[in-house]
Curated annotation (Swiss-Prot):
Note in the entry: The genes involved in HC-toxin biosynthesis, called collectively TOX2, are organized into a diffuse cluster that spans >500 kb. All of the known genes are duplicated or triplicated within this region, with some variation in copy number and chromosomal location among different race 1 strains.
Record-level GO cellular component terms: nucleus
Principal localisation: nucleus
Location of region: Disordered: 209-243
Basic and acidic residues bias (residue ranges): 212-221
Gene: TOXE
Classification via PANTHER family: ANKYRIN REPEAT AND PROTEIN KINASE DOMAIN-CONTAINING PROTEIN (PTHR24198), ANKYRIN REPEAT-CONTAINING PROTEIN-RELATED (PTHR24198:SF165)
Lineage: Eukaryota, Fungi, Dikarya, Ascomycota, Pezizomycotina
GO molecular function, one term: DNA binding
Protein's name in the database: Transcription factor TOXE
Residue numbers spanned by region Basic DNA-binding region: 14-40
ANK repeats: 289-318, 322-351, 355-384, 413-440
Domain notes: Contains a basic DNA-binding region at the N-terminus which is usually found in bZIP transcription factors, but does not contain the characteristic leucine zipper domain. Instead, four C-terminal ankyrin repeats were identified that were shown to confer protein-protein interaction of regulatory proteins.
Keywords noted in UniProt: Activator, ANK repeat, DNA-binding, Nucleus, Repeat, Transcription, Transcription regulation
Location in the cell: Nucleus
Length: 441
């Protein structure tokens, strides 16, 4: 078998490439030719012209184009090309003259219609001014009027009783059923001023809640009777002093402003039916504000500032009406950082409320395992170190117990923390109490 030399292989590859290039050029030339033929055929079909196909011959059109008809007529009657040019110019001038006449006619018709419309609009405007009416819309069919000043609707703001254009409008008297809803009472064209009963019923529907569904804490000043607007101009409860309904947010449930049916909304000596007073309900709140500077510093974690306030005489263990101190409230809210901060500042650990519940009772009820562990660890460390402050605090609050029995302290119902953990199904807390030597008998 013969072998092929490298030169012959290179020559063969070159010949193949040249042949492929030639085939590509031929294919591209054929493609361009076909595209041109298709474009000419499509143009002839769209313009309905006669087209001479190179292979199919002449393709006759169904109708002649205007240019073809003009050329045929000119070739039959005017074989001279100069005459044909003159005919085309005359035809063009006639067409332009016809278009000019049509445009002039359209402008004339439009001017006449505009004049008629202006005349109608002027007449309509004069009729409106004569009758002192106000129209709305393109055709003027919809009619609006303020009505007679004697039957005008009573508004909340007396300034709104003036006319829109300070005119004495007589047409379109509003119906007596026209009402204006001002939030608390509804007044109409023939309505009476709001009575004391209606206003009180409307106020009773108002509910002032915080974002976390807690009542507001605020002492609202009473508005004098003379500050309320007259009943002839309507009534607005906030027109005298709108700031009376602005309450600052609070997270406590101690002081609340509650509007109820038996709240003294209207005093007996009130002379105006619009004089409303939001009074404080008799709620059981702490004697000291929960958000005092000391409690604010503790909530922010600034124990250094809290110590300065304590050294300056700020109270820490003042109980509220139910006997709960700030430490009791922190345990009830399950705020571990607040409980730890209060204990570090020396808050009374053995204090109980009026029901005899200790911090441990409250922690078991709220199912706070972390606070229970913290209290038990602090109790154990205080017992081991024989903390004098712990015993002093126990004697100070009248608890006739020793520090060793604090974990087994009973409330007024005779329940210990172990009892509560069993009643409330707290197995983890029960194991923790047993670990710290709580009495299970």
């Amino acid at each position: 078998m013969g072998t092929t030399s490298p030169n012959s292989e290179k020559r063969q590859i070159t010949d193949i490439n040249e042949r492929r290039k030639l085939q590509n050029r031929v294919a591209q030339r054929k493609y361009r030719t076909r595209q041109k033929t298709r474009m000419k055929l499509a143009e002839a079909v769209l313009n309905d012209y006669t087209y001479i196909h190179p292979t199919l011959g002449t393709i006759q059109s169904k109708k002649k184009s205007p240019l073809t008809m003009e050329c045929d007529r000119s070739s039959a009657s005017y074989p001279d090309l100069s005459s044909y040019a003159e005919i085309c110019s005359e035809t063009r001038s006639e067409t332009q003259a016809t278009r000019a006449r049509q445009l002039t006619s359209q402008r004339t018709c439009f001017r006449e219609s505009v004049d008629n419309n202006q005349a109608d609009s002027h007449a309509q405007l004069s009729r409106c001014l004569n009758r002192q009416e106000m129209f709305y819309g393109i055709s003027g069919e919809t009619e609006f009027s303020e009505g007679d000043t004697r039957d005008r609707v009573e508004c909340i703001d007396p300034n709104l009783t003036r006319g829109w254009l300070d005119m004495d409008l007589r047409s379109g008297t509003p119906n007596s059923s026209t009402v204006v809803d001002c939030g608390l009472c509804t007044v109409g064209a023939n309505s009476q001023p709001p009575t004391r009963t209606n206003v009180q019923e409307a106020i009773e529907t108002l509910e002032l809640f915080e974002p976390n569904d807690q009542r507001k804490t605020e002492n609202l000043p009473r508005e004098p009777c003379g500050s309320c607007p007259s009943s002839s101009h309507g009534y607005s409860p906030t027109s005298g002093n709108p700031s009376t309904l602005l309450l600052t947010p609070s997270e406590s449930l101690m002081n609340s402003v509650i509007v109820t049916s038996d709240s003294p909304l209207l005093a007996a000596d009130d002379k105006s039916p619009g004089d409303l007073v939001i009074s404080e309900a008799n709620t059981h709140g702490p004697k000291e504000d929960q958000f005092s500077p000391l409690m604010t510093a503790i909530s922010l974690g600034r124990l250094d500032i809290a110590r300065i306030l304590l050294q300056s005489g700020a109270p820490l263990d003042i109980p509220d009406d139910s006997g709960k101190t700030a430490l009791h409230r922190a345990v009830g809210r399950r705020e571990l950082h607040m409980v730890e901060a209060l204990l570090n500042l020396g808050a009374e650990m053995l204090a109980t409320d009026h029901e005899g519940n200790s911090l441990l009772h409250i922690a078991v009820k709220t199912n706070s395992l972390s606070i229970t562990r913290l209290l038990l660890e602090r109790y154990k460390s205080c017992r081991e170190l024989k903390d004098a402050q712990l015993g002093h605090g126990c004697r100070q609050h009248g608890n006739q117990v020793h520090s060793e029995s604090w974990i087994d302290l009973r409330n007024r119902e005779g329940m210990t923390a172990v009892h509560l953990s069993v009643i409330f199904n707290r197995p983890e807390i029960l194991q923790l109490l047993v670990k710290y030597s709580a009495n299970v008998n």
